[in-house]
């Protein structure tokens, strides 16, 4: 299978460690082709240590008279937040790109992030990058923390190993 970055990726079944998850940030920012977000210059982010994916559903609820006191609900919106931690690695294109966004605002923080799961599934996310922390203790390695926040609807592609 070929991923969004145009690379061939081998997939296997079974249980996997988190380090088997591949991810990339588009260092060219967010680009659109025919109204679709398309990555132009995807790069890995070297020395990333942690990746946590959260999905938030906007839920509307109401209490109809015929519900006999029971609440009804409907998920009307979704968003994805990916929280990441990394060591600052100067000279790595992905790491430098993220660190370079720490003082940026507005559309300068738009990008495209894609995740390739070990089973071959791929999640492509038009996003906003929010750098939340740089630095650390005097004897620690320079740290970097950031969030990838979905900006519009992501694309989910089932991989060849998916059921």
Predicted regions span which residues?
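Hydrophobic alpha-helical segments of small multi-pass membrane proteins
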Residues: 105-111, 131-132, 147-149
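Solvent-exposed edge beta-strands and adjacent loop segments
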Residues: 2-88, 126-147
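Generic macromolecular interface patches on structured domains
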Residues: 94, 157-158
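Intrinsically disordered, low-complexity terminal/linker regions enriched in Pro/Ser/Gly
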Residues: 160-163
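Hydrophobic lipid-interacting interfaces of membrane-associated proteins
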Residues: 151-156
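Short acidic, S/G/P-rich loop/turn micro-motifs used as interaction or catalytic elements
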Residues: 91
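Short, acidic/charged, Gly/Pro-enriched secondary-structure junctions
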Residues: 94-126
């Amino acid at each position: 299978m070929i991923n969004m970055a145009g690379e061939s990726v081998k997939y296997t079944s079974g249980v996997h460690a988190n380090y088997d998850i591949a991810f990339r940030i588009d260092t060219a920012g967010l680009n659109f082709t025919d109204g679709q977000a398309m990555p132009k210059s995807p790069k890995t982010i070297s020395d990333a240590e942690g990746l946590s994916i959260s999905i938030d559903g906007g839920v509307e609820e109401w209490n109809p008279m015929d519900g006999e006191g029971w609440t009804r609900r409907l998920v009307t919106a979704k968003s994805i937040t990916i929280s990441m931690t990394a060591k600052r690695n100067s000279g790595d294109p992905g790491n430098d790109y993220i660190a370079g966004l720490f003082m940026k605002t507005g559309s300068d923080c738009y990008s495209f992030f894609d995740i390739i799961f070990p089973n071959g599934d791929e999640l492509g996310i038009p996003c906003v990058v929010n750098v939340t922390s740089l630095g650390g203790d005097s004897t620690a390695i320079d740290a970097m923390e950031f969030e990838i926040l979905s900006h519009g609807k992501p694309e989910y592609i089932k991989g060849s190993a998916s059921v």
